[in-house]
């Protein structure tokens, strides 16, 4: 199952919040990728052990680096650009220029491929949110 949304952002049973900062990368003006990276971190921090924007790797208008430790305790360095996110290293603040990994349009898609525990946490959060919406609808 590929998860491509954040269950915490469900605004109703019929759709997701409009205007989210992470609604795709294409068609956007040049952004400060550090701000985008912070938004990515805040979106999925609930489903990983640790995640933060790198303070030692250079961030610019067109690139930012995010360190993530999955619930399986695997560490990755992610590169965020207009093209999306990809793994660039297998430890915090590590960039391996020879590593050939695919870009993912969303952090959800990337983590879905890296971490079975992320998928489980995502699914549980989605279920809890849907149950809360159902309870709210019955009251």
Swiss-Prot record:
Give the residue ranges for region: Interaction with GSK3B and acts as a GSK3B inhibitor. 115-139
PTM comment: the record says: Phosphorylated by GSK3B.
Domain of life assignment: Eukaryota
Residue ranges of region Disordered? 1-22
A single GO cellular-component term on record: nucleus
Q: Where is this region: Required for PRKAR2A interaction?
A: 41-45
One GO term in the molecular function aspect is: protein kinase A binding
Ordered alphabetically, the record's keywords are: Cytoplasm, Nucleus
- The site feature described as Required for GSK3B interaction is recorded at 130
Listed under GO biological process in this entry are:
intrinsic apoptotic signaling pathway in response to oxidative stress; negative regulation of protein kinase activity; positive regulation of canonical Wnt signaling pathway; regulation of Wnt signaling pathway
Q: Where in the cell is it found?
A: Cytoplasm; Nucleus
The text of the family note is: Belongs to the GSKIP family.
Its quaternary organisation is: Forms a complex composed of PRKAR2A or PRKAR2B, GSK3B and GSKIP through GSKIP interaction; facilitates PKA-induced phosphorylation of GSK3B leading to GSK3B inactivation; recruits DNM1L through GSK3B for PKA-mediated phosphorylation of DNM1L; promotes beta-catenin degradation through GSK3B-induced phosphorylation of beta-catenin; stabilizes beta-catenin and enhances Wnt-induced signaling through PKA-induced phosphorylation of beta-catenin. Interacts with GSK3B; induces GSK3B-mediated phosphorylation of GSKIP and inhibits GSK3B kinase activity.
Kindly give the PANTHER family that the UniProt entry links to this protein: GSK3B-INTERACTING PROTEIN (PTHR12490:SF4)
Role this protein plays: A-kinase anchoring protein for GSK3B and PKA that regulates or facilitates their kinase activity towards their targets. The ternary complex enhances Wnt-induced signaling by facilitating the GSK3B- and PKA-induced phosphorylation of beta-catenin leading to beta-catenin degradation and stabilization respectively. Upon cAMP activation, the ternary complex contributes to neuroprotection against oxidative stress-induced apoptosis by facilitating the PKA-induced phosphorylation of DML1 and PKA-induced inactivation of GSK3B.
Q: What is this protein called?
A: GSK3-beta interaction protein
